[in-house]
Curated annotation (Swiss-Prot):
Pfam families linked to this entry: Polysacc_synt_3
CDD domains hit by this protein: MATE_tuaB_like
InterPro entries: Poly_Biosynth_Transport
One GO biological process term: polysaccharide biosynthetic process
Membership in a protein family: Belongs to the polysaccharide synthase family.
UniProtKB keywords: Cell membrane, Exopolysaccharide synthesis, Membrane, Transmembrane, Transmembrane helix
Primary residence: membrane
Species: Klebsiella pneumoniae
Keyword Zinc-finger annotated: no
NCBIfam families referenced in this protein's UniProt entry, alphabetically: PRK10459.1
Membrane topology reported for the UniProt record: Multi-pass membrane protein
CC per GO annotation: plasma membrane
Name of the protein in question: Uncharacterized membrane protein in cps region
Length: 485
């Protein structure tokens, strides 16, 4: 099977896993938003940001270092495994110590215990991360997708059950711990077919390149995490837990799901791009195809949601959350802009150029934090959303000059087309939904479904009749894949 078909087949399995996680995550958010009080939901929202941080730091970029290197020895794998274990213990201790300072800064004393409980992930997760990386490297996403979907399902069930019984934010922590534990146990069992780590005294210089790559990747992830999640602690400190719940509810609808849809493609594309990292022209063509595909998926979903946001919030979360509608609409636009620049990380990892992203993220922190802080003080939760939108516009613009141009050369036309052309394809749907929203002002489930069907139908028709070459190629590839399946 060619790399192209293998990549698309892997994308199918990765999509199934990611969509399962997105659907379960959305259901969990809807259920908990209805059974928890706004204050408890606010505490839970803060912990969700903590979960993202622990997921990001759990292997300190070592997994992607394994994927990035074309040929890696068993001794190098074993050395990286034990480095991961020791780093996990170190991060566990540091998190326990810092938990009190974090809870004090956010003015929520109860956070310290929940953060300490979450820190157990640093002890658990490293035991399975390497096997996960090896499966990704070989594009074996069928097995990996089943493991991740099952693990997330068990965590979802526990979270909802404890939430219904206790009506306490701690339910999410216990569910998260079960998800991580279940995934690690299964990965450790299944992954033994690749190799069994051995204890062998290795010289760090033997894995120096991987450690350096991991360092840049981790530093970049931390800086990127600060840029994308700093709004939550700012809102918590300035406005309080209830507004954190409202902001993060909007954020989890408009920004998080699309950010999980993009990795459906980028997660598979990183190993694929790594295999062609030395062919610059082929790399450029495939990367911009990726940007187009992501825009074709995200633009209609987010811009459509922006128009029917009031109906969505009332029907899904209930009347008590209607105050988040303006915030949700702004974050939908911000989410669409964010997705345009999001896949660049895969390109930089494939080329082992993470130092470019690190420098860029330093620049973004200097710009973003003041913008977000003062916009929140200026206009509360809506101001925070406006600040985030401004930051994403800056990010989309500067990404070309700081990241794309140094790696791919002068490609400004390709970059603009990667979001302008998909936006043009979305316009008929947007215009029709605006007309529907004007003439159908009554909120009901029937009218809500009708708007979705009309908007979705118009967009699918637009894609179907479009003469765009990339769309024709993608339709042909997926048709070929379905026939082979």
């Amino acid at each position: 099977m060619s790399l192209k078909l293998k990549t698309i087949k892997s994308t199918k399995w990765s999509a199934l896993s990611s969509l399962t996680i997105i659907v379960l995550g959305f259901l969990q958010m809807v259920i908990l938003s209805r059974i928890l009080e706004p204050f408890e939901f606010g505490v839970l929202s803060i912990m969700t940001v903590v979960f993202l941080f622990t997921d990001m730091l759990a292997d300190c970029g070592l997994s992607n270092a394994i994927i990035q290197k074309k040929n890696i020895t068993l001794d190098e794998l074993s050395a990286l495994y034990w480095v991961n274990i020791f780093l996990g213990v170190f991060l566990f201790v540091v998190t326990i110590i810092l938990s009190y300072e974090i809870s004090s800064w956010m003015r929520l004393d109860r956070l310290s215990f929940l953060i300490q409980l979450t820190a157990l992930v640093f002890i658990i997760m490293p035991h399975g991360q390497q096997y996960r990386a090896l499966m990704q490297k070989e594009l074996e996403f069928d097995i990996l997708s089943k493991i991740e979907s099952f693990s997330y399902l068990t965590g979802f069930c526990l979270t909802v059950i404890i939430g219904i019984i206790t009506k306490n934010a701690s339910c999410a922590v216990f569910g998260y711990l079960l998800t991580v534990s279940m995934r690690t146990v299964i990965l450790s069992f299944v992954g033994r077919k690749y190799y069994h780590p051995t204890w062998k005294r290795s010289k760090l210089r033997e894995i120096k390149k991987q450690l350096l790559f991991s360092f840049y990747l981790t530093l970049d992830s931390i800086l990127n995490y600060i840029n994308s999640s700093i709004t939550t602690p700012i809102v918590a400190r300035v406005l309080g837990a209830i507004y954190v719940g409202g902001y993060n509810l909007s954020f989890n609808v408009a920004v998080n799901p699309p950010s999980k849809i993009s990795p459906i493609i980028t997660r598979v594309l990183f190993p694929a791009l790594s295999k062609i990292q030395d062919d610059k022209e082929r790399l450029r063509i495939n990367f911009f195809k990726l940007l187009h595909v992501i825009s074709y998926i995200n633009f209609p979903a987010l811009l459509g949601l922006c128009i029917i946001a009031k109906d969505f919030v009332y029907l899904v979360f209930g009347e008590k959350w209607l105050f988040i509608v303006p915030t949700l609409q702004l974050l939908c636009i911000a989410g669409a802009m964010r997705m345009v620049a999001n896949p660049i990380g895969s390109l930089l990892m494939a080329k082992a150029k993470m130092e470019l992203s690190v420098r860029f993220n330093f620049v973004k922190i200097i710009i973003f934090i003041p913008v977000l802080y003062f916009s929140t003080i200026w206009n509360g939760m809506v101001g925070a959303a406006i600040g985030f939108l401004i930051c994403q516009a800056i990010n989309a613009l500067l990404s070309y000059f700081f990241l794309l141009k140094p790696v791919l050369g002068n490609c400004i036309v390709d970059y603009i087309n990667s979001f302008f052309i998909p936006f043009v394809h979305t316009l008929p749907m947007i215009l029709l939904l605006l007309v529907c929203d004007i003439y159908i002002d009554k909120i009901s489930l029937t009218f809500f479904i009708l708007k979705i069907v009309i908007g979705g139908g118009v967009y699918i028709l637009t894609i179907f009749i479009s003469p765009n070459k990339l769309l024709a190629e993608m339709k042909g590839l997926f048709r070929q894949l379905l026939l082979k399946s």
